[in-house]
Swiss-Prot record:
CDD domains: Ribosomal_uL14 (cd00337). The gene is rplN. This is Large ribosomal subunit protein uL14. It comes from Methylobacterium sp. (strain 4-46). Binds to 23S rRNA. Forms part of two intersubunit bridges in the 70S ribosome. Belongs to the universal ribosomal protein uL14 family. Part of the 50S ribosomal subunit. Forms a cluster with proteins L3 and L19. In the 70S ribosome, L14 and L19 interact and together make contacts with the 16S rRNA in bridges B5 and B8. GO terms for molecular function: large ribosomal subunit rRNA binding; structural constituent of ribosome. InterPro entries: Ribosomal_uL14, Ribosomal_uL14_bac-type, Ribosomal_uL14_CS, Ribosomal_uL14_sf. GO terms for cellular component: cytosolic large ribosomal subunit. Disulfide bonds: none annotated.
Amino acid sequence: MIQMQTNLDVADNSGARRVMCIKVLGGSKRKYAGVGDIIVVSVKEAIPRGRVKKGDVMKAVVVRTAKDVRRPDGSVIRFDRNAAVLINNQKEPIGTRIFGPVPRELRARNHMKIISLAPEVL
């Protein structure tokens, strides 16, 4: 469950290390984002010579949340940290690699490029 001012790790090699959510997209009164939702983020920490730099405002897909995600079969999946993948306006990842596992809920949200780049889908 991601809301405004939430800090997230970046799970790709776009050059950003930490980002902060500044808006949850999908309705004017929407407060929270979950796995697969698109948010607007500000880059708070970045590596030198990366594709993005500190202060950039980007869109991102939430790929991991510390709040558990319930599945239709009753099972629950949760992660240790909140993480996101930076995307462009065509909803394609900016980075060329994804680090760490991603949940299969991304498939239902049509983020197939992220699924294909991920080393493990839970």
